[in-house]
Amino acid sequence: MDYTTQMDAAKKNVTTKEMEVVAEKEQMEISELKMLMAEGKIVIPANKNHKSLSAEGVGQGLKTKINVNLGISKDCQNVDMEMKKVEIAIAMKAEAIMDLSSFGKTEEFRKKLINMSKAMIGTVPIYDAIGFYDKELKDITAEEMIGVVEKQAKEGVDFMTIHAGINRETAETFKRNKRAMNIVSRGGSLLYAWMELNNKENPFYEYYDKILDICEKYDVTISLGDACRPGCIDDSTDASQITELIKLGELTKRAWDRNVQVMVEGPGHMALNEIQSNMIIEKKLCHGAPFYVLGPIVTDIAPGYDHITSAIGGAVAAASGADFLCYVTPAEHLRLPNIEDMKEGIVASKIAAHAADIAKNVKGARDWDNKMAEARQKLDWKAMFDLSIDPEKAIRYRKESTPEDPDTCTMCGKMCSVRNMNKVMAGKDVNILRED
């Protein structure tokens, strides 16, 4: 192998098998794909040890991808349930799965996940450190934190959230600028607490070059975590968020100098009118690196419905330049999602991603909608179900309320506009009260 990472291969004009897979999926010329990868505007997260991976690209000109979060917590330790979620996420064509397990020894679960998943796998190494070393946060050493990164890289993790932007300088900006909700990033809050408790620099920032060594060796894509993402709409686009984003832009260039692929993570909670400008700011400050957003959630008043608040924000964000959406479920802010929550979150995120791809004029994005329009015009119900983003739900709704005329539905019956236009344009009579 005469290259170290996918980015290195692109810079050397070497075509990898992963590039071939992505180019075919995206209907993009290999030459264009390699050019954008060499510039850092597209990443293909593909750890050398993830053998079951079906590669996906994230970035400029590609379809918007979605990520599904899962994993065990101290209060919910049902590994079998989480593996069932993995199977469903893959069946529903999620392109990425993040193991956010935050309790105990997670290695066995993660290895099983990597072995079975054709979706790219992401993690947040700081979550694993406490359980792996069985130590309180303040007692974990910087070397041990870096050790977790290396351990997970060896296991085959494709991308890792590394909160390297929350350094002492960013922390001071945070202290000087009051927020309604402080730091809501789980990984970011842990690292901020570690810095304060130990009066030391963030290990992920101080030893960033060591992390780059690891990521280059295994071709792990760094997902630069936004520790200072807003946790409510009142905190969005503030000094802490932007200070960290500037730092993430600098860290992006350092990674590129080592041929390490980079994504940048973003908000968060944010009012609709701020989303587009935030996408522009990220692309500018982070030099066109792919943007991975959690939501954004556009209002804070909808517990139980945050898959909707997130889909609204995600559609606007992706239409304005975001490349990767982290799904949000109805259980957000309330509890660990169950399987039904997960399904709803995936569907909502996929709708947002697809709507954005239409707006961005991504190649082939409209084809799906055009086929649905054709099926509806023909009143071809089987085709409509087959084309539905959630066929199971569409079929169930149809069966729950059966119309007299099988061509129609119980909303309009024989007043169905499509039915009647088809008839009259074919020179036939339109009978509403009588049998045809």
Swiss-Prot record:
GO terms for molecular function: 4 iron, 4 sulfur cluster binding; carbon-carbon lyase activity; zinc ion binding. [4Fe-4S] cluster binds at residues 409, 412, 416. InterPro entries: ThiC, ThiC/Bza_core_dom, ThiC/BzaA/B. One of its GO terms (cellular component) is cytosol. Binds 1 [4Fe-4S] cluster per subunit. The cluster is coordinated with 3 cysteines and an exchangeable S-adenosyl-L-methionine. Keywords: 4Fe-4S, Iron, Iron-sulfur, Lyase, Metal-binding, S-adenosyl-L-methionine, Thiamine biosynthesis, Zinc. Catalyzes the synthesis of the hydroxymethylpyrimidine phosphate (HMP-P) moiety of thiamine from aminoimidazole ribotide (AIR) in a radical S-adenosyl-L-methionine (SAM)-dependent reaction. Belongs to the ThiC family. This is Phosphomethylpyrimidine synthase. It comes from Clostridium acetobutylicum (strain ATCC 824 / DSM 792 / JCM 1419 / IAM 19013 / LMG 5710 / NBRC 13948 / NRRL B-527 / VKM B-1787 / 2291 / W).
